[in-house]
């Protein structure tokens, strides 16, 4: 189930994105990117509709996925 990011309290959204970024360990190339920059990038993807927040009822987990997967 897709959860609209606008329906999530700002502090909760920030924590969700932070947890996602720390878990993913995304490779940003040879340039070091700050944690806040990574969080801002994911938030921007959510705002642009490029990424969505997904709740798995089966596993009772929340994740952020690229919208193209849905």
From Swiss-Prot:
The organism's place on the tree of life at top rank: Bacteria
Signal peptide positions on this chain: none
InterPro entries assigned to the protein according to its UniProt record, in alphabetical order: UPF0270, YehU-like_sf
Family (UniProt): Belongs to the UPF0270 family.
Name of the protein in its database record: UPF0270 protein VIBHAR_00073
Higher taxonomy: Bacteria, Pseudomonadati, Pseudomonadota, Gammaproteobacteria, Vibrionales
């Amino acid at each position: 189930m897709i959860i609209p990011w606008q329906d999530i309290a700002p502090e909760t959204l920030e924590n969700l994105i932070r947890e996602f970024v720390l878990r993913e360990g995304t490779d940003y190339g040879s340039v070091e990117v700050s944690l806040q920059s990574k969080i801002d990038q994911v938030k921007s993807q959510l705002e642009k509709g490029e990424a969505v927040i997904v709740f798995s009822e089966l596993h009772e987990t929340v994740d952020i996925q690229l919208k193209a997967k849905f």
